[in-house]
Design a protein with these regions (language model features):
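Small/flexible residues
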Residues: 4-5, 45, 62, 183
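Sec-dependent N-terminal signal peptides
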Residues: 4-17
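Accessory recognition modules or surfaces
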Residues: 25, 29-35, 53-76
Length: 188
C-alpha cells in the first residue's frame, strides 16, 4: 500500500511539474527560445519577416483567416516572451465590432469564457459613428481576457491613428512573466 501511495504521489508530482513547464503557444509554436528560431518557424508557416529590433521582430501574414495581419514578437533577454497580432485596420464601428465579436466567439469556443469589460467612459453614444469616434478618443474599452494553464490571451480594440482602429490579440506566457517578475523582484 505504501509503495502504491509513493508511486501515485511521484506520478502526480511529475505531472504537476510537467504542466508548470509548458509554455503558451502561438500557431503551435511555444513562446520560448531565441528570436531567430521563432521567426524561422513563423516564416515556415507563411509569414514574411519585415523588421527586427533589439526588442523583437515584426512579421506580416495570414492569421485566423485574415490576410495582412501584423505580428509583433517581443523578447526579453533575447528570448521570445510574448506575441501581439494586429488585425487589418477598420474605419467603422460595425466593421471593427464584427471582427472583435467573431474572434471573441472563436476564442471562447477554444479557451472558455473570458473575463470581459465592454463599456464606454460615459453614456453609450447613440450612433455607430459616435461609438467609433469614442473608440478613437480612447473613451471606451472592449477587452476580453482568456486565461489558460500556460498563459493568457487578451483580445481588445484600439485606436491606430486619427481615423482607424484595429482588433488586437496578445499572447502572454506564464513562465516568461514569472521569470520577468523574478528579475524585477531581484532588482528591488
Amino acid at each position: 500500500m505504501r509503495k502504491l501511495l509513493s508511486t501515485f504521489i511521484f506520478a502526480l508530482m511529475t505531472m504537476v511539474t510537467f504542466a508548470q513547464g509548458e509554455h503558451m503557444t502561438f500557431k503551435g509554436i511555444p513562446l520560448q527560445g531565441p528570436l531567430n528560431t521563432f521567426i524561422q518557424k513563423l516564416k515556415d508557416k507563411g509569414f514574411t519577416h519585415m523588421e527586427q529590433t533589439k526588442d523583437g521582430a515584426l512579421l506580416k501574414g495570414k492569421f485566423a483567416t485574415y490576410n495582412d495581419c501584423l505580428v509583433f514578437v517581443y523578447t526579453e533577454k533575447s528570448n521570445v516572451s510574448s506575441v501581439v497580432v494586429l488585425f487589418p485596420e477598420q474605419e467603422t464601428w460595425n466593421a471593427i465590432t464584427n471582427r472583435y465579436y467573431t474572434l471573441k466567439e472563436m476564442l471562447t469556443e477554444k479557451y472558455g469564457m473570458p473575463e470581459t469589460i465592454e463599456r464606454f467612459s460615459d453614456e453609450e453614444p447613440i450612433s455607430d459613428f459616435l461609438r467609433f469616434y469614442a473608440l478613437l478618443k480612447d473613451e471606451c474599452i472592449y477587452k476580453s481576457e482568456f486565461k489558460t494553464k500556460n498563459g493568457s490571451i487578451v483580445l481588445t480594440m484600439k485606436k491606430v491613428d486619427y481615423r482607424t482602429a484595429s482588433v488586437i490579440i496578445k499572447y502572454n506566457d506564464n513562465i516568461n512573466e514569472e521569470e520577468s517578475r523574478k528579475t524585477m523582484m531581484d532588482d528591488l
